[in-house]
Amino acid sequence: MRTSISLVLVGLAALAVAQRAEAHPHILVDAHVKLLFDQRGDLTAIANVWDFDEAFSAYAIQGYDSKGDGNPTRKDLQPLADINMDALKEYHFFTRVSSGGPPAALGAPTDYWDEFTDEKMKLHFTIPLKQPVAVRGRTVTVDVYDDEYFAAVNFPADQATAFADEPAGCSNLIRRPERLDATIARQLAQIPVTQRELPADLHAVTDRLVNAIVVQCP
């Protein structure tokens, strides 16, 4: 069985138990995503800002507040960011880039840090691709999700596809998953925090809860 996602995110086995021990998902994430392109128009990296829910955030920052005023600095939180990146690597950062073949290989994260603002922890990080992905004449999809649904990763309502130096003439769309059926949601709510992997029938459902950015270029 893989490492608990609570360990992935904060390195504390007690975290999810203290917050949402009774239900999947245990952590809520709003993922803001920007696609980065080089001068040739190839996709080179994905820049991310993840906003965690307030309950999770309040617990996650405990022990990292050097001033004791409830507002840890970016410097305070850097050890936590190091833990985040090292552990999320096992899950490919909940990110998959594909263009019809096998998923693109991801490199080591760069420009990463945590901040605490507006009662939420925000994780900033950029994932470079080991090799640029050509987008001309093809459809490229960037999926962002946790297939085990321990963390519910969503594109926020105001998320618009954000490009940096994108090729001219490209179109894009945001694709969000359908709402969970109430019966499935109740079944997920009965799964304890200690169970990372879902039963096959439920995994078949959560594996479709994919947020995607779909890019098409002439």
Residue ranges and their predicted role:
Residues 100-218:
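Mature, soluble, non-transmembrane domains
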Residues 25-52, 56-58:
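Early extracytoplasmic/domain-onset interaction patches
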Residues 55-135:
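Structured domain cores in non-transmembrane regions
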Residues 1-5:
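Positively charged n-region of N-terminal signal peptides that target proteins for export
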Residues 6-16:
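Bacterial N-terminal signal peptides
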Residues 28-29, 89, 107, 208:
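Short solvent-exposed loop/turn micro-motifs enriched in small/polar/acidic residues
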Residues 18-20:
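N-terminal signal peptide c-region/cleavage motif recognized by signal peptidases
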